């Protein structure tokens, strides 16, 4: 293939980026001087300092935060905790819990966003109750919790066909660590362990598709320069996570989250939608900085689209409002269902956004502290189904 044919495979913006990269490398090599005199060192340092800014900015453009950066998932992990209990037999689905707004675990008083009082298992997901999740984690036990966390893909590679996927094995606990009751309690509602957005999206897909964990991929097909198909990239099921029955139950719980729980702003007329909000306190906890998110899907009975939106430290006076992420996810979904040709299921207006319905906040608050090196980048939003916008890293919270 000649150069002209090769370049025809790329857009002009991609070609410009490749040219820029070549120029960057040439500039970098040009600054590597063999002159070790003091004057030369000072001069070279000035040049390299200036150019390093350019290099760093350029490299950031090529960083895929969805697979390279990690954060605590927050309450978007709660459906996994419930699915673990249902699948393992630790839960029957008929459980009730009593939430006083906090739970004393050892010597730590770990909070919930509201005083929920008596609450069913389904409502514990819909209303995002930390107290219920902690009790569920204790009922499952450390071994079962860790086993299913691994099955769902947390702490292991997704196998996506992209370079630069972060190794997160050290960012989750093992079964022996979960013998600490506080660790198990906070992990049950999505804090004190880290994951990438792709890990969350891939695992979540298995929750709602009947329990099949597919290898995520970007490339659908490889063609030759004359358009002939060289290779088709088909679907690859890596493992089974949960049963069809458990998956159907979890979908119904998350549909209620959108209908009457913390995700009501995700409603779109004519579409059945399920989802889960997330509001994770970042470290240090006392700074009250938050990583908010919403992961939603449609249709509920036979999901065709999943969108995961995150906002790191939203630029508002009250950050712990997952409704901001819900609204963004809804805007994305309204456009994407048209692009993908996903038709409305009904003209019933009962599942539309009610402007008078107050969006409940979903705060996975905890009084526990952990050491962390945190890289912050405020006001950044990403969707796993659309182009990523600089979703920054919040280092391992252990």
Language-model regions, residue ranges each:
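Short, gly/Ser/Thr-rich active-site loops of penicillin-recognizing serine hydrolases
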Residues: 229-234, 326-380
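Short, well-ordered alpha-helical segments
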Residues: 244, 248, 323-331
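A short acidic/glycine-rich loop-to-helix N-cap element
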Residues: 313-324
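Polycationic, low-complexity disordered segments in secreted or periplasmic proteins
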Residues: 373-394
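Beta-lactam-recognizing serine transpeptidase/beta-lactamase-like catalytic domain environment
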Residues: 1-75, 80-311, 393, 397-398
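A periodicity- and composition-biased signal for non-globular, repetitive helical segments
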Residues: 282, 365-366, 382-385
